[in-house]
Amino acid sequence: EVLEGLLDPPKYFPDNVMLNKEGYDESDEIINRSFNSLTAEEVNNMLKEKVTILDVRSVEDFSLSHIPGSIFIGLDGRFAPWVGEILEDVSKKLILVAPEGREKEAIIRLSRVGFDNVIGYLEGGISSWIKNGGKISKVLNESASEFSTADNNKHILDVRSKNEHKS
């Protein structure tokens, strides 16, 4: 009864419990090793390794152009809970695509929930990626009226949590 209505803990939570028990790196140390600007060519070469591109820009910017296979979790909003839900593995190596001037903020906010394996960020953002011939993907955004008048062979997938659905 006491726990009724509470959300399940995020998937990264057990890892954070271990971090709290065993200790973790100082914030300055994490920032120093993570705050690395990477050229588009360097990022492209790293895609062959097991790295995850985390795009933390606005949903509008991500929709217009993003690196194929990148994961979108915008800095504005419920960043930490979504990071924990989507990324799960705190040991993942991350490369950031961030709004200019907010790279350090993203690194700090990731480290607060145990994700401190940021390799660096894409220098010059997505425009440098495009300028250097990098492939991009786009997301089609439609209004409800556009969706309802378009092809009837579409399905809606509700991905809200139980608590979100109730409200």
Predicted feature residues:
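Short, catalytically relevant binding-site loops at active-site mouths
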Residues: G101-E103, I126-S128, N163
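Short polar/charged helix/loop
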Residues: F79, I119, K162-S167
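Active-site neighborhoods of enzymes that stabilize oxyanions during catalysis
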Residues: I130-H155, R160-H165
